[in-house]
Curated annotation (Swiss-Prot):
PTM remark: Phosphorylation of Ser-114 and Ser-119 are critically important for mitophagy and for the ATG11-ATG32 interaction. Phosphorylation depends on both HOG1 and PBS2.
GO terms classed as biological process: autophagy
Biased composition (Low complexity): 12-24
Descriptive protein name: Autophagy-related protein 32
Organism whose genome encodes this protein: Saccharomyces cerevisiae (strain RM11-1a) (Baker's yeast)
Length: 529
């Protein structure tokens, strides 16, 4: 351990007032006669454990005023036994205990060496990064860790501040008030740098200072209507927000995020410029008026693109109670996570921004999960409609085919038992099919001449209509009827389209369309349906 302190000239006689118990320790004092020698350097072979294990004396009042502050990242517990052992080290033992060979009346620097490489450790301490030193200054008198960049894990250095007595005070004089203590702390102080290497038996000192508070999740409300908005917040969420006590923009870095409430876009831009000036990269939550969401998003795009601010929550309309409730619930969850992870994560705005982005991703995943049951139900409904439509179409097609088959069979049976006036010899079915002409209604046979179309067929003759279900040539008769029907329908459609106004007249005047033929076409039309 290395002790660096500065002693006043009038403290040379402080060794006279040493307590009698100090003689039992392993630290020897020098006599007043040895004024020309070095004084302030202790035995280099003493270790920290030997100083902590010395017994037989009670801590002096000056030793009780010892102020120690060790900042060890990730360890926030206080060990009273170790802190008591440190308080047992008396300032007079540190200031008035010398080695006879190295005593001097002049102001010198003393050191307690725990190893032989203290010069390298001091050099590494002096070569510490400037950012670590600035961090120590900002934290005030409580100290901070100074870790060398070359040996981040092999060496642990801590800074402890010890108060020394005033000019006119004896070692056992009690201080009257706290003001004298502060003056003595500011004027006379000893900086002890303890270096623990991996080669020695070392222990880790826990944090002894109870003045430093853990970071708290707090959001600052900015804007002219901030007070009214704060009053409208439910009481269970008001602890997360805070109004500015002093109109000082320098307090922005102390808060986790900033809530911006405004009525005009110019006010929003001015508030964002203040935040960027005093605390760049701070997470913000804009609360706008109805109808300003799109304009607010356009303004935020430029700030977010340049990484001037970060968005902790999307813009919320002040009159939308539902979105405000979602925002309050989300911030409460963030505060709980922030309090749990404060010992493991750094207190910076980037971690908060990461949480906000993870929250957006989780929210999208939850929305997709909520939508998935609906998406599963929709195909079922489609399948039901699909089966229903197919069932309906199947029934209709079946009925249509059955009806058509019945009508076709009825017509073919009537065709077989028709009465022929002009035809003496009935031709065979195959000869009739081959000699059938689609343009005429005659059946040419080698034995007979072709009669007129009006005298060849007599359909639906009541006297001669006999249906024979066991007749031969059902397929050939069906093909003949279909072919004849197709030719008749073509002629009928052409005439109907060419002369729509004289449709009935054409039916009566035309020799090809008799009443019987029209009835036959009407009957065959049901087959097509």
């Amino acid at each position: 351990m290395v002790l660096e302190y500065q002693q006043r000239e009038g403290k040379g006689s402080s060794s006279k007032s040493m307590p009698p118990d100090s003689s039992s320790t392993t630290i020897h004092t020098c006599s007043e006669a040895q004024t020309g020698e070095d004084k302030g350097l202790l035995d280099p072979h003493l270790s920290v454990l030997e100083l902590l294990s010395k017994t037989g004396h009670s801590p002096s009042p000056m030793g009780q005023n010892l102020v120690t502050s060790i900042d060890i990242s990730g360890n926030h517990n206080v060990n009273d036994s170790i802190s008591g052992s440190w308080q047992a080290i008396q300032p007079l033992d540190l200031g008035a205990s010398f080695i006879p060979e190295r005593c001097s009346s002049q102001t010198t620097n003393g050191s307690i060496l725990s190893s032989s490489d203290t010069s390298e450790e001091e050099q590494e301490l002096l070569q510490a990064p400037a950012a670590d030193i600035i961090n120590i200054i900002k934290q005030g008198q409580e100290g901070a860790n100074v870790v060398s960049p070359s040996h981040p894990f092999k060496q642990l250095q801590k800074i402890i501040s010890l108060p020394l007595p005033g000019k006119e005070k004896t070692p056992f004089n009690e201080q009257d008030d706290d003001g004298d203590e502060d003056e003595a702390f500011e004027e006379d102080s000893v900086t002890i740098t303890k270096s623990l290497t991996s080669s020695t038996n070392s222990f880790v000192m826990p944090k002894l200072s109870l003045t430093q508070k853990n970071p708290v999740f707090r959001l600052l409300i900015l804007g002219r209507t901030g007070s009214s908005f704060y009053q409208s917040i439910p009481k269970e969420y008001q602890s997360l927000f805070e109004l500015p006590k002093y109109h000082d923009s320098a307090t922005f870095p102390q808060y986790t995020g900033i809530v911006i409430i405004f009525q005009e876009l110019r006010e929003m831009v001015s508030l964002l410029n203040r935040i960027v000036q005093y605390s760049p990269g701070k997470p913000v939550i804009p609360i706008c008026q109805p109808g300003q969401v799109i304009q607010v998003k356009n303004v935020l795009k430029s700030f977010l693109r340049n990484k001037l601010v970060k968005l902790l929550f999307p813009p919320v309309v002040v009159t939308n109670k539902r979105d405000l409730k979602k925002m309050f619930q989300r911030l409460q969850d963030l505060s709980l996570e922030y309090g749990e992870d404060v010992n493991e994560e750094d207190n910076d705005d980037e971690a908060i921004h990461t949480k906000s982005r993870s929250y957006c991703r989780n929210k999208k995943a939850e929305n997709s999960k909520k939508k998935s049951p609906k998406s599963n139900k929709k195909p079922k409904r489609k399948k039901q409609k699909f089966f229903t439509s197919w069932f309906t179409w199947g029934i209709s097609i079946t009925i249509g085919i059955s009806f058509g088959c019945c009508v076709t069979y009825f017509v073919t049976a009537a065709y077989e038992h028709q009465t022929v006036k002009s035809l003496s010899l009935r031709p065979s079915i195959l000869a009739s099919l081959l000699s059938l002409d689609s343009s005429s209604d005659t059946i040419n046979t080698p034995a007979t001449a072709s009669p007129s179309s009006t005298e060849q067929f007599l359909w639906f003759d009541k006297g001669t209509l006999q249906i024979n279900f066991h007749s031969d040539g059902f397929i050939m008769k069906s093909l003949t009827i279909i072919k004849e029907t197709w030719g008749k329908m073509n002629t009928f459609v052409l005439h109907a389209l060419s002369k729509p106004l004289k449709f009935l007249e054409n039916l009566n005047k035309s020799s090809e369309f008799s009443i019987d033929e029209s009835n036959r076409i009407l009957a065959l039309g049901y087959i097509l349906l």
